[in-house]
Amino acid sequence: MAIHSSFEALAYQSGFANQFSSEALPGALPMGQNSPQKHPLGLYAEQFSGTAFTVARNEARRTWLYRIKPSAAHPRYQRMDRQITGREQGPINPNRLRWNAFDIPAEPVDFIDGLIALASTSAADQAEGVSVYVYAANTSMQRAFFSADGEWLIVPQQGRLRIITEMGVLDIGPLEIAVLPRGLKFSVQLLDGSARGYLCENHGGVLRLPELGPIGSNGLANPRDFLTPVAWFEERDEPVQLVQKFLGELWTTQLQHSPFDVVGWHGNNVPYTYDLRRFNTIGTVSYDHPDPSIFTVLTSPGAVHGQANIDFVIFPPRWMVAENTFRPPWFHRNLMNEFMGLIDGAYDAKAEGFMPGGSSLHNCMSAHGPDNITAEKAIAADLKPHKIENTMAFMFETGKVLRPSLHALACPQLQADYDACWNGMARTFNKESS
């Protein structure tokens, strides 16, 4: 598969969930209707639906594609011998878990073969929940792929990616994210020698911006900072492998044409990128550490109002100015289930053991919080204003328990001594001080 030129500047459209439109050739988009009897350029009209037809209009996600050959032009899929590592859920385990970063493989591995399933909330046939993966790759994909199981949120930690999609081309690197709609065909090219990162597959309602409430009309992730690609296509009639993920399994078929043959499109079921450095961080200017929900970038609502199917939360560089306050994230037992990763630098609640590329999992009611070293320093700190810099941690927080995979519980990256970071917590209680 030809690789889109690695260094040319890409064009984007700005906004979130807009009714976008783009054409790579004049006349690719029909005027005044979606499905003309005969397209002026001889293209096929194909609707790409990300929601049911009858959802509320403000919830609807769909895009009309105008392509050289319809997606229906393919032979039967066959189950692949090689499947994603870690597909099998492990036994119930209530313990706090933490993993070191996974190494880049020595043998050639592309983005799909480099996926490792760490945890999931439910079987892939459920219309809710999430699955969490890490990836480590050292070669560009020479095939195309789509997931029928959910929307993909890709969080690079190392190495830049060029993602060729049916609707255009987008680039991301560390401190940026990409969201790919369920079912969108794409291919990942490596712009550096290798790449590593995290992936959340959202099986539930599509990701959207959180409500701002009393914050007002601006703040957190601003809509204009989300970028959607412009139409780009290739006209090639040659064999291309197409892989799909269906109910957690990989199946493959052989196309006789490029799947990236969309000459024009319009709609709002689209891929997009976002630069996490543009997040407008909100925090206290008086006392106490606010709830981490103020750091939410994107959310997928759950069945219970206010309880997310998945929240994507970041902990970016920020000023700490709270007075008379224990400033690190406080000790916590949570109804929600927290998977954390570290993109860059250090996390302010963990002095050691949590490195870039690493992960941790604290499920429902697992007690967690700053480690012993961090807590001691915070209690004794001189509370001058200071800025936390060189950091970018994130959290996938879900209302459903994340079951670790068998592989995640057996792999050498799992830290056997994670609980030890809370050993020796000093007894500082002094009833004589009352």
Swiss-Prot record:
Which parts of the chain are coiled coil? none
Task: Indicate which residues the UniProt annotation says bind homogentisate.
Answer: 347, 368
Molecular function terms, GO-annotated: homogentisate 1,2-dioxygenase activity; iron ion binding
Name the InterPro entries for this protein.
Answer: HgmA_C (IPR046451), HgmA_N (IPR046452), Homogentis_dOase (IPR005708), Homogentis_dOase_bac (IPR022950), RmlC-like_jellyroll (IPR014710), RmlC_Cupin_sf (IPR011051)
State the function annotated in the UniProt record. Involved in the catabolism of homogentisate (2,5-dihydroxyphenylacetate or 2,5-OH-PhAc), a central intermediate in the degradation of phenylalanine and tyrosine. Catalyzes the oxidative ring cleavage of the aromatic ring of homogentisate to yield maleylacetoacetate.
Q: Which HAMAP family match?
A: Homogentis_dioxygen (MF_00334)
Protein name per the record: Homogentisate 1,2-dioxygenase
Task: Write down the species.
Answer: Pseudomonas syringae pv. tomato (strain ATCC BAA-871 / DC3000)
